[in-house]
UniProtKB/Swiss-Prot annotation:
Its cofactor is Co(2+); Zn(2+); NAD(+). This is 3-dehydroquinate synthase. It catalyses: 7-phospho-2-dehydro-3-deoxy-D-arabino-heptonate = 3-dehydroquinate + phosphate. Catalyzes the conversion of 3-deoxy-D-arabino-heptulosonate 7-phosphate (DAHP) to dehydroquinate (DHQ). The gene is aroB. It is an enzyme of class 4 (lyase). GO terms for cellular component: cytoplasm. Belongs to the sugar phosphate cyclases superfamily. Dehydroquinate synthase family.
Amino acid sequence: MERLTVTLGERSYPITIAAGLFNDPASFLPLKSGDQAMLVTNETLAPLYLDTVRSVLEQSGVNVDSVILPDGEQYKSLAVMDTVFTALLQKPHGRDTTLVALGGGVIGDLTGFAAASYQRGVRFIQVPTTLLSQVDSSVGGKTAVNHPLGKNMIGAFWQPVSVVVDLNCLKTLPKRELASGLAEVIKYGVILDGEFFSWLENNIDALLALDDTAMAYCIRRCCELKAEVVAADERETGLRALLNLGHTFGHAIEAEMGYGNWLHGEAVAAGMVMAARTSERLGQFRAQDTQRIIDLLKRAGLPVRGPQEMSAQAYLPHMMRDKKVLAGEMRLVLPLAIGSSELRGGVPHDVVLGAIADTQQAQQ
């Protein structure tokens, strides 16, 4: 069992990583006998895990209700979140309830925002079931829903009280979803840890094969890196923005193509290449390092170009609505070397457009 802590003073919380955690009542602390909980999951995951998690909580004396939402990024909306509020109010659940987010990034983000909003804030536990949510979205307290004009535009910073990562969930994960999660894994190596990037180059096949030892180390290292960043910059005023490498381009792809048509990790993968090409054009990143990123993304089964039907010009309106825009100026996370990155403002739009064109046209 791997265990680490996100250090935020009185709001610190544990991340527990192991196979079989869903069968251990202690995994879901601080829930205890007499507590009330609302399990939030989706229609795909409910047949796989809902009864197991409900049963282990009820064995501990927790009073459990549940709500099952439709599955897909297109349902990460205020309208669907209202379903959670209705379920909470119908029982009713008070301020002492705990929401349990049993699912991937959509369920985690939506449930977290519901927890931040319901009766001005209740506890919630993250139980991520996808690799992407296990290494990224479940840690750090960023919660949100989408708006037709932009991804994650309506939300709050609201930390969970615990993160429970059961490695067995990955055994039921579609290969495309596994690859999507590996995009966020690779991102950590590019922005923060060159040694980890090299480890990924040597172990990507083991991760694709769901080797328990390799996967446990991979998830722990990603969570360690994110926990360090969140502890230093919880509200994303500086350092934490580096975690958005590829996301400004990627969110543009998701919004333009319609949420759910490109998985988040797929869009981020293409966005990372575009960010690397931008940094190349600015003379601060080596072409051979861009190629290392491309090669690793391809081995993980990820796209290294954006949608062919999306013009370079189509990216800009979405990118100018990005949350990192400051005083009307686009700011991009750009790699400086494998394991080092910066948040840079004032990148000329023609450089960005050229980098997108480079990505789309290059022989990769």
